[in-house]
Each structure stands twice: as C-alpha cells, then as structure tokens.
C-alpha cells in the first residue's frame, strides 16, 4: 500500500486512466462486433459504416498508445479483407 501522498494520488490517476483506456478499447471491439454482425446479415451499408468507425477507433487507440500500431493494422487489414471478399461475392451473384 502506498504511504506517500504522491503515490496515493498516482493510484487514483492510474485507476482513472485504466478505466478510460478500457472504455476506448471496448468501443473499438464493439464496432468490430457490429461489423461482423452486419457481415453475417449481409447489410453492406451497415458494414461500411461500422468498418469506418472501427478503423477510426482503432487508430485512436494507437494514438493514445492503448494498443500497438501493428495490432491495429492487422485488425483493420482483416476487416478490409472481409469487406472486399463480401463485395466480390455480391458481384459474382449479380453476374
């Protein structure tokens, strides 16, 4: 347990930052889940909207140093690949 006042304050600050970081990370994951749900439903407009929001939130997490930039790049790349695959499947069905 911290004895110095500055150490006690830092415990409070760290708890607050941890909650904020968790919230930001959770928000990004929720948009990824919404994207996947839209993919399963076949709703392209909703997919595009959630892809943009997920990408934006992942980049924001990188800027705040919550997740590593390579992790965000990998997740965005995989989402983009799923979006592209969905588009190609829709074009094949239309043809």
Swiss-Prot record:
Instruction: Mention one GO molecular function.
Output: small ribosomal subunit rRNA binding
What are the record keywords, sorted?
Ribonucleoprotein, Ribosomal protein, RNA-binding, rRNA-binding
Q: Which domain of life is it from?
A: Bacteria
Segment forming the signal sequence: none
Q: Name one GO cellular component term.
A: small ribosomal subunit
Matches recorded under HAMAP family: Ribosomal_bS20
NCBIfam families, sorted: S20
- Protein family (similarity comment): Belongs to the bacterial ribosomal protein bS20 family.
Q: What is this protein called?
A: Small ribosomal subunit protein bS20
